[in-house]
């Protein structure tokens, strides 16, 4: 009981917490045989493959991992593996020399050892947050950013190890059913996604959790919305990536560091059917038309829906030249005359979308008959990606957002988190959609929560 309380003090999803708990559990094994047995089970339940020791192309770079896997009790106790894609040295000093011609034998050999873990059911792959897209690879010399090439090589190595583990002859192993990718780069890899390797692994996954990261710009992200990956990836995610997992998924998390779903890329989930989906977590998703959320409403099996910092866009300013390739869905937008809100730029197009959370909440209540748990909140800093159950139930004032393509560093203009006040164009012009819609939004929010509560009983 004491050991169990110790283990619950820290979140088991955080690698730093795992290492902290492990420091306390190691001496507990010395108390008696019973404590040794209990502590061992907790100690090795989650294993972390991290770059440790001297990373010089040989096995010493993964000494901790390899020593742990040499212990039979550890191999049998492991249920989850966290794989760190690169070392702190690589992130700080841009040392990527271990990856040569797409090969890093010490790392890939360490990854392959998951075949020796008969009881794991979950894999987490943690990339670094910074990444470079195609344009930066050609024009910018930043070496402290994890390259897209090594990211893909790591992803392939993990998938290959999962597949090889599943088809080992004369060996009974659990099926790896949960896949978490932290900081997956928003770069389409169609050849890999269309490969037999990808599909062989995807067919067994029933819990998929993705946090997407995007182009890192050392000089500021004010032009990042023009990078081609921001235009391409969401369509790729909808049409190629997710369909490979759709049949068996019971839980899905789609979270981006940046606002997504509306522009420059567009995601409306059209054609996506998840017949077994029970839990859906969305982070930073922006609704921009009256049918934008229909893909969620069509998942009739949903029992839990969590919206973490999701918004409805209110006012939009785009540049006709810079955004002409964007797949803008203007059908529910009202065009505003030039000069509105003090915006007189020659290429500026101004729009307003009158969508409300009142309408969205009512649709959720009426279209998801099995929904029992609904969460709606705004993150304070980082997304609740690894801890979705911490998402609250708050009708926060910043639930509406504006978009101004001419504003930096980000074109997404979030509302004041306390008052809901919004800015657009001339900063002497202000608006407050949360106040305008407060009565209707609050009524629909209460009705939705009440319906979920009744279904629990």
Where are these regions (language model features)?
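Short regulatory "switch" loops immediately downstream of catalytic or recognition motifs
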Residues: 4-14, 24, 51, 86-90, ...
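Leucine-rich repeat
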Residues: 34, 40-45, 58-67, 72-80, 88-274, 288-294, ...
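Leucine-rich tandem repeat or coiled-coil scaffolds
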Residues: 80, 87-97, 116-124, 129-153, ...
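Hydrophobic regular-secondary-structure patch
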Residues: 1-102
